[in-house]
């Protein structure tokens, strides 16, 4: 009997023990986008810093750990060519935890090059400052090729501008508060620290915000997310900079919960293609984190990328042809025999971030982040007063200014044209100062001027941001089928915009007066003052010394708050989500100096009078025009909503439909008529309304991948503001357009197929779109010196221009057909397109990877249907009607037409290898060759000048030549790295 009881007790103990170890963890490891399974990944099970078990994923990406006691575990997932990840899992009540999917992102060969290099164009005053909008790829078959491979051509995803792509850092929205642009340059050179990121494409939502219609990217940047270990690399890129040195270290999360990381780099030297362009940039990241327990984690990190960089300028084709080089750069010249660039960007914008993460259970997690951005961003440019234009490619220095074969241009001085052409085409030191900036002459002019008052100077246009941000979000798994995500973010931005005297170029001082105003109001000394208060107090214009502010000085004040939520329901392969945002945007201008032209009222509310003349002025609606003090506050209610449906079938098939509507506030820089000079807002400012949808099919199985997407986006009520010299008015003017509408529709196709040789795959992508303007916006043109409205009408040929029926051609001149009433017969309309991106792009790529870590890649690309950026002046009745105001078919077809760039074909290749030493050290290299056919005639962008040439008979206008940017010829990037 006693033996029987002992056996029974032992049996019950064994059963109890077995029931305590019935728990487990299972999941499938998949590529983050496309959900392709990752076979052969190493999964490690860790508890309290001790490695318990390991598993290798099956061909379908699955793994399983069985017989686990209740408790909290860490799962670490690593795979070749992927960025590893670690997640926390709790096993309780003896149940098998099914995590469904563990997602990891692929490491690209090209990740060692800075995406920001393609985003910083230094073209703010040319109207061409959009960055590529797909540099952060999500690694499906389409974006894997397009995301990096199309960077050289400055491809815009679906034709969208940079500001439509939402970029987050540690969960904080980082798009620029003033312009909305993506802020790539803020972390340029910190590849390792910023490598860990989550991205969505198009209308997909994320864990950090609802986002817009051009994807969301969140860069983790916390120290525990930086790749563990040491890494050193040296890189040379012939198209960007001569040398990049980089080092990084990350401890990972230690047993005591602490984590440390740093990343530093230097980018130095010029490149093989553009003279005067150089880098002298440095970058430093440092971070520390502490996990106090399984619920609480705190991370603190800071980084900055101080440096300077010489910039390139666009020029006309005439100049490029005279120099025999499409890479000619008019920004530089020789000073004492050394190259000096007049356009140099200086940056130092440190960022400090504190992030708190709270994970009380597997079903709920949340974070809160505080981020501060400070420092300065500026670029230099030549300034001059009472002197000749010092730019070498100024139109009066070119042969075409003196002579053109067409007599109607009234340029008939052949002798001067011949001399100018000779001076431009000689390649001897004697003519270098004609083809480039003559720095020595500028110094001599200043030195010999009375009192050494500088006629020439080097200004620095500064943008100093003080940007305080807060963001918080949560993720709650309410039931196994329903997840709720939500959060809030807020921003307080104070940005000072001003000019700084960078270099007096040998002079003693520079007068702080408005040279454009002096030409029109020379008899009234007060009106020409940039700082009227100084003039009234001292009786003369301020003498500006080096390092002093001058010209303009104002604050852009932005306040922003946003709430968002996203509900996701999943069942049996079907997923539905509904997301929305609600926010408030407010901004105003605060002038810090009083400009003579727009004196406003004094501190007592009275008009300002000088020597019997009233300086206070009023706009066309009777409102006082002020330059100093606070402007009217613009406040907008913003909101958006998204709906997403997806169905995943067995065998790797996935169908999805996304739709969204967005009501966004206009940006600060497109809301003021002339923020440099006055507080006047654009009339009838409205929110931008966008309706967008896409339909997707994806297939991933057995190494085969396919993605097909059709998309549509309609954008309404955009605003654009620009300033330019109007020849018809002989004055500097401001041009404000409202009601700009666009339509983007297109097709994306990506396919990857494994070939007959193991490790060899073929990939092909197609991007076809039609990105067109769909409205003729309203425009108001004002004189910059007086705010006088000189034109308020629609821009009749903005969205398209007519093509007229030709009756005959006589001596090479078209004779247009007319109807019975004498009206010219229109045969059709030619659409006008979104600029500076190919609307047809294709690529074919072969990739070969060996088991001993060699890789080879060869790709061919074709781009077409890219268009020049238009200016509105050429699409007005004024420009098309000429001096006599009569529009003829030939004038309209000539003046309103939009230039289409020639197609381009490129061939690229890369090779690389890595070696492992004692399973501890890795050394490797990658060599990439771009544009191997050395095609030097590929236009990547440009813009129309806003100048007009009056004909000999004063009855019509001709255009100034447009200015272009070209892609560099054959170039290489060599990267050598060592890590352990």
Report each predicted region and the residues it spans.
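Transmembrane beta-barrel wall of Gram-negative outer-membrane proteins
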Residues: 24, 236-269, 273-312, 344-363, ...
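Extracytoplasmic beta-strand/coil segments of soluble accessory domains associated
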Residues: 132-173
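Short acidic/polar hinge/loop motifs at secondary-structure boundaries
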Residues: 134-135, 141-145, 172-203, 220-222, ...
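Acidic/polar loop-and-plug regions of large Gram-negative outer-membrane beta-barrel proteins
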Residues: 297-355, 378-459, 523-547, 721-724
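Membrane-embedded beta-barrel scaffold of Gram-negative outer-membrane proteins
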Residues: 365-369, 656, 660, 670, ...
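Structural signature of Gram-negative outer-membrane beta-barrels, strongest in the C-terminal barrel
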Residues: 465-467, 477-485, 489-500, 505-506, ...
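Gram-negative outer-membrane beta-barrel transporters
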Residues: 570, 711-714, 735-873, 977
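C-terminal beta-signal and adjacent terminal beta-strands/loops
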Residues: 715-717, 862-884, 913-980
């Amino acid at each position: 009997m006693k033996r029987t009881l002992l056996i029974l007790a032992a049996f019950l103990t064994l059963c109890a023990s077995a029931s305590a170890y019935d728990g487990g963890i299972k999941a499938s490891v998949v590529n983050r986008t496309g959900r392709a399974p990752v076979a052969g990944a190493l999964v490690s099970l860790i508890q309290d810093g001790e490695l318990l078990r390991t598993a290798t994923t099956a061909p379908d990406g699955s793994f399983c750990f069985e017989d686990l006691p209740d408790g909290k575990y860490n799962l670490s997932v690593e795979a070749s060519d992927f960025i590893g990840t670690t997640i926390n899992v709790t096993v309780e009540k003896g149940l098998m935890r099914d995590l469904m999917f563990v997602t990891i992102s692929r490491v690209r060969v090209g990740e060692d090059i800075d995406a920001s290099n393609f985003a910083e164009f230094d073209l703010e005053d040319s109207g061409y400052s959009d960055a590529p909008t797909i540099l952060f790829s999500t690694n499906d078959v389409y974006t894997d090729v397009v995301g990096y491979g199309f960077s050289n051509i400055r491809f815009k995803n679906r034709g969208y501008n940079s500001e439509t792509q939402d970029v987050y850092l540690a969960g904080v929205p980082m798009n620029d508060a003033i312009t909305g642009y993506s802020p790539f340059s803020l972390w340029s050179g910190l590849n390792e620290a910023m490598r860990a990121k989550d991205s969505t494409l198009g209308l997909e939502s994320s864990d950090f915000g609802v986002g817009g219609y051009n994807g969301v990217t969140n860069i983790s940047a916390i120290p525990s997310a930086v790749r563990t270990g040491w890494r050193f690399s040296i890189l040379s890129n012939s198209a960007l900079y001569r040398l990049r040195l980089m080092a990084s270290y990350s401890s990972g999360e230690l047993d005591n919960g602490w984590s440390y990381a740093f990343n530093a780099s230097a980018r130095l030297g010029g490149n093989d293609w553009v003279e005067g362009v150089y880098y002298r940039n440095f970058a430093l990241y440092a971070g520390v984190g502490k996990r106090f327990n399984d619920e609480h984690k705190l991370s603190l990190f800071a980084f900055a990328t101080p440096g300077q960089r010489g910039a390139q300028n666009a020029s006309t084709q005439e100049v490029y042809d005279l120099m025999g080089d499409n890479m000619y750069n008019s920004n530089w010249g020789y000073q004492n025999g050394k190259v000096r660039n007049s356009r140099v960007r200086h940056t130092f914008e440190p960022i400090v971030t504190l992030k708190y993460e709270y994970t009380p259970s597997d079903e709920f997690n949340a974070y809160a982040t505080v981020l501060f951005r400070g420092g300065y961003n500026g670029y230099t440019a030549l300034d001059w007063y009472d002197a000749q234009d010092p730019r070498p490619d100024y139109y009066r220095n070119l042969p075409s200014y003196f002579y053109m074969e067409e007599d109607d241009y009234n340029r008939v001085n052949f002798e001067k044209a011949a001399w100018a052409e000779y001076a431009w085409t000689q390649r001897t030191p004697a003519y270098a100062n004609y083809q480039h900036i003559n720095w020595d002459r500028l110094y001599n002019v200043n030195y010999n001027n009375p009192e050494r008052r500088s006629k020439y100077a080097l200004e620095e246009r500064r943008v100093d941001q003080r940007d305080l941000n807060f963001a918080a979000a949560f993720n709650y798994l309410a039931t196994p089928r329903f997840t709720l995500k939500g959060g809030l973010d807020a921003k307080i931005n104070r940005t000072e915009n001003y000019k700084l005297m960078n270099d007096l170029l040998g002079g003693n001082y520079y007068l702080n007066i408005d040279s454009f105003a002096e030409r029109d109001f020379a008899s009234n000394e007060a009106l020409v003052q940039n700082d009227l208060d100084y003039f009234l107090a001292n009786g003369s214009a301020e003498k500006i010394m080096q390092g002093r502010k001058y010209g303009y000085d104002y604050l852009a004040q932005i306040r922003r708050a946003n709430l968002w939520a996203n509900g996701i329901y999943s069942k049996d392969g079907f997923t539905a989500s509904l997301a929305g945002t609600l926010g408030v945007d407010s901004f105003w201008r605060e002038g810090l100096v009083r400009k003579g032209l727009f004196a406003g009222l004094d501190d007592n509310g009275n008009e300002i009078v000088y020597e019997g003349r009233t300086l206070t002025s009023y706009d066309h609606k009777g409102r006082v025009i002020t330059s100093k003090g606070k402007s009217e506050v613009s406040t907008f209610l913003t909101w958006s909503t998204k709906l997403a449906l997806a169905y995943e079938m067995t065998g790797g098939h996935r169908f999805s439909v996304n739709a969204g509507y967005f009501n966004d506030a206009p940006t600060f820089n497109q809301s003021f008529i002339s923020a440099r000079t006055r507080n006047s807002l654009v009339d009838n400012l409205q929110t931008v309304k966008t309706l967008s949808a896409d339909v997707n099919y994806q297939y991933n199985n057995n190494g085969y991948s396919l993605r097909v997407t059709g998309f549509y986006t309609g954008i309404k009520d955009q605003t654009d503001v620009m300033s330019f010299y109007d020849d018809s008015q002989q004055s500097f003017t401001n041009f404000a357009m409202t009601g700009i509408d666009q339509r983007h529709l297109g097709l994306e196709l990506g396919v990857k197929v494994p070939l007959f040789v193991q490790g060899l795959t073929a990939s092909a992508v197609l991007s076809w779109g039609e990105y067109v303007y769909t409205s003729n916006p309203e425009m108001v043109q004002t004189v910059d010196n007086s705010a006088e409205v000189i034109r308020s009408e629609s821009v009749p040929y903005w969205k398209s221009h007519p093509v007229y029926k030709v009756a005959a051609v006589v001596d090479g001149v078209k004779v247009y057909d007319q109807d019975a009433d004498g009206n010219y017969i229109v045969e059709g309309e030619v659409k006008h397109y979104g600029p500076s991106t190919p609307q047809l792009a294709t690529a074919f790529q072969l990739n070969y990877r060996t088991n001993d870590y060699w890789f080879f890649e060869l790709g061919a690309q074709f781009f077409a249907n890219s268009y020049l950026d238009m200016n509105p002046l050429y699409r007005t009745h004024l420009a098309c009607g000429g001096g006599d105001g009569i529009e003829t078919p030939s004038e309209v077809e000539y003046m309103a037409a939009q230039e289409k760039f020639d197609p381009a074909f490129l061939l690229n290749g890369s090779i690389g290898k890595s070696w492992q030493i004692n399973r501890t050290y890795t050394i490797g290299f990658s060599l990439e060759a771009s544009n191997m056919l050395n095609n030097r005639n590929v236009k990547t962008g440009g813009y129309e000048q806003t100048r007009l040439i009056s004909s000999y008979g004063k009855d019509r206008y001709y255009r100034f030549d447009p200015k272009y940017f070209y892609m560099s010829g054959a170039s290489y990037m060599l990267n050598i790295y060592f890590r352990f």
